[in-house]
Amino acid sequence: MSKEKEEIKIIAQNRKAFHDYFIEETYEAGIELVGTEVKSVRQGKVNLKDSFARVENNEVILYNMHISPYEKGNIFNKDPLRPRKLLLHRHEINKLSGYVSRKGYTLIPTKVYLKRGLVKVELAVAKGKKLFDKREDIARRDAKRELEKQFKEKQLGI
């Protein structure tokens, strides 16, 4: 029996994280949500800007992830910015707490997606970039773009 490719639907991405941080390692984590939050996530009403995670009491908690209230949720809607527990294996939590205990490392969510009907968060172990690192990345990207442009012109014979 052949394995089918797992269906992944990306709901939200934190593009700013790749600009502001060096991504060391990523983990896939489940997230503890209530019913109306799941419905909002399925509609794509998630914002990862300024969100981060911490290891507290051997649990990973996600802060500042905004999930808009579900329109038809009435009294069952929760606070959009409430802390949410991430579901990881114990050995993964221990590894993450080891990373975070080192100076300069933090946990940043980079993606929220649906995998086989379940809401998942891609959590990255990240180290903050300095201003000169960001400038260096921009210069490298511009140089690469210029080289590709020259190569394309040479190919076309312009």
Swiss-Prot record:
It holds the Pfam family SmpB. One of its GO terms (cellular component) is cytosol. GO terms for biological process: trans-translation. Keywords: Cytoplasm, RNA-binding. The keyword RNA-binding applies. Its main location: cytoplasm. HAMAP family: SmpB (MF_00023). Belongs to the SmpB family. This is SsrA-binding protein. The lineage of its organism: Bacteria, Bacillati, Bacillota, Clostridia, Thermoanaerobacterales.
